[in-house]
Amino acid sequence: MFDKKKNMIRIFIYENVMLYPPTLNLIECLLNNGYKVHLVAEGVRDLPAIIKENKQFSYTEIKAVKNSNIFLRLKKRSVKTKGYRAALKDTMDGDIVWTVNPSVVRTLGKELLEYSDRHVMQLMELTDTYPMFRGAKILKFNIKHYAQKAWKIVVPEENRAYIQKVGWNLEKLPYVLPNKPYYLKSGEVQEDMLPVIEEMKREKRKKIIYLGVISADRDLQSFAEAVERVKEDYCLYLFGKFRGDGAEEFKKLCDSYSSLKYMGFFNPPKHLEFLKYADIALVPYKPGEIEGSGFTILNALYCAPNKIYEYAGCNIPMIGTDVLGLREPFEKYNIGVCCRDLKPETIIDAIRYVDANHDEMVKNSKAFFDSADLDYIVNSIVND
């Protein structure tokens, strides 16, 4: 049985933890509520001081695998897998094992089933079948079996909870833990941020901003084209790390529009600093299947972006695509608008509408941000 004074919550995440702001939020929430946390992940050295300097926090850093030679990459991946599994074996009686993505469940493998009675399985994406390895089209990892055996399932959005329960025939409805920032402090301004801040301060046009992953399920092209048509009044700033295929296409996109400015990637929470200089924010989700990802075709339709909480917390009204995960909070709280289609004229109308109703949407943002109580939800997951 979990004893808060004696036991810890061991969080496992595959990939660099700094690419997952919701995981940082979870760690901050757990620490602030007096739990001991041990993180097993890549990128631990870049964690914010508020986490690393907490006496209740410890970690095992897994070295990243970066090599163009497929044989060396496979060899290093094998070493990486052993590192995760060794960290799992360090789990003490009563500790909670909290996995953050299906990739780490696949990596931990059958050994994880030994901890099923205290395994919290968090799903950042709406998941169906999962590839045995990245890009695999036929070979599948039985992620459903691990979910059915897990103690608790956690998802970031209510519709996803019901879909996941039915799709995987789960006994209980998953907990809903929104992707909301625990703190909205960007921290000390670093030297590499100064040129970007100065650039945004000098810009006289109204600034539309996108913060987040740059990937196939984000339709930046349509918004860039629309902003270009009203570039005398607006410009578009993109921040984020590219993921997946299509790097050349993204470079062409950046080169094609004079109103578009790509500013690179900044580790969270530093990226929040740039929201101080923005007027409107984008959430450009593109519904559809991403082959080999393991996410269902409904993933983007029922999106649950941490960005809408970051934007709302920083009082930035939003424009998004027409997906239910955005339409519901936008209409309930009046904090943004969804474009019914992605024609330039439709997007421009949305920009003009948000601009005209900016002050009202800013006032409404606080009510939306305050609607989720992370402390209550996380304590319920751990203790119920």
Question: Each PLM stretch: what is its role?
Answer:
Residues 10, 181, 196-218, 224-227, ...:
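Conserved donor-binding/catalytic core segment of Leloir-type glycosyltransferases
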Residues 28, 82-91, 121, 127, ...:
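Membrane-proximal helix-turn-helix segments that form the acceptor-binding/catalytic region
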Residues 41, 45, 211, 236-248, ...:
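Glycosyltransferase donor-sugar binding loop
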Residues 99-105, 123:
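Short His-centered aromatic/hydrophobic patch
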Residues 177-178, 194-195, 341-345, 355-384:
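A charged, aromatic-enriched C-terminal amphipathic alpha-helix characteristic of glycosyltransferases
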